[in-house]
Design a protein with these regions (language model features):
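Hydrophobic beta-strand residues in large extracellular and virion-surface proteins
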Residues: 108, 126-129, 157-162
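Short, basic/aromatic beta-hairpin or loop at an interaction surface
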Residues: 129-141
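Alpha-helical transmembrane spans
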Residues: 11-94
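Extended hydrophobic/Leu-rich segments
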Residues: 10, 50-53, 102, 118, ...
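Structural detector for short beta-strands of small beta-barrel domains
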Residues: 97-119
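Short aromatic-glycine-enriched beta-strand elements
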Residues: 114-131
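Short, charged cytosolic
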Residues: 1-9
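A membrane-cytosol interface segment of integral membrane proteins
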Residues: 138-193
Length: 193
């Protein structure tokens, strides 16, 4: 079976999340230092009696407001888009690492290259035909495939075995006769033992 994710993916996502947070705090500290400098310059001004001192006072207050406004706007944008997406991707990989995995056997239909966003993570979809015990009919299942990973190179009608977690593809491969024999032996052993 071909694994979609590796341990290095988890480590890369963790490093990316931490680096983005470090970059944010570095940028925020620059804005904070600039704000403190202009505030100290404002406090060191003498009482505003002349036009020149009043204009400096207004300049320092305006610069402080502008710097603070830019810092707030950039914080919302930065923490709302790149950091949030990196955090969601890391959370997905962390859930995959410890979560329950489900093994299925289905008939492959096609890959859908359109982008689907689920939980702030982008996916493509792999469409398979799967038997439903509840409705007693075949149903189309849209299995999520990470956008950053290559799509499975399968043909329409291939019988595949795949493992998912929360409908996200973790590994896949062609169904083989040896797997059937192995699973039958396990089932017979469970019934006898």
């Amino acid at each position: 079976m071909i694994n979609v994710y590796e341990q290095s993916d988890y480590e890369k996502a963790y490093k990316l999340k931490k680096n983005l947070l470090r970059y944010y705090f570095a940028g925020l500290s620059v804005f904070l230092i600039a704000t403190v400098i202009f505030f100290i310059l404002y406090l060191r001004l003498p009482y505003p009696t002349t036009k020149q001192i009043k204009s400096k006072t207004n300049l320092y207050l305006a610069l402080n407001c502008i710097i603070t406004g830019i810092a707030i706007i950039l914080s919302f944008i930065y923490l709302g888009i790149p950091y949030q997406r990196a955090k969601a991707y890391f959370k997905l990989l962390d859930d995959i690492k410890v979560g329950q995995k489900v093994k299925n056997v289905s008939t492959f239909l096609k890959n859908d290259e359109s982008v689907v966003e689920v939980g702030n993570v982008d996916f493509h979809t792999m469409i398979v035909l799967e038997w439903s015990d509840k409705t007693q009919e075949f149903m189309r299942r849209h299995v999520l495939v990470d956008k950053e990973k290559p799509m499975p190179n399968l043909k329409n009608g291939d019988i595949i075995t795949y493992v998912t977690h929360a409908n996200v593809l973790l590994s896949y491969g062609y169904k083989s006769e040896e797997e059937d024999l192995f699973e039958e032996l396990i089932e017979k052993g469970d019934k006898n033992g």
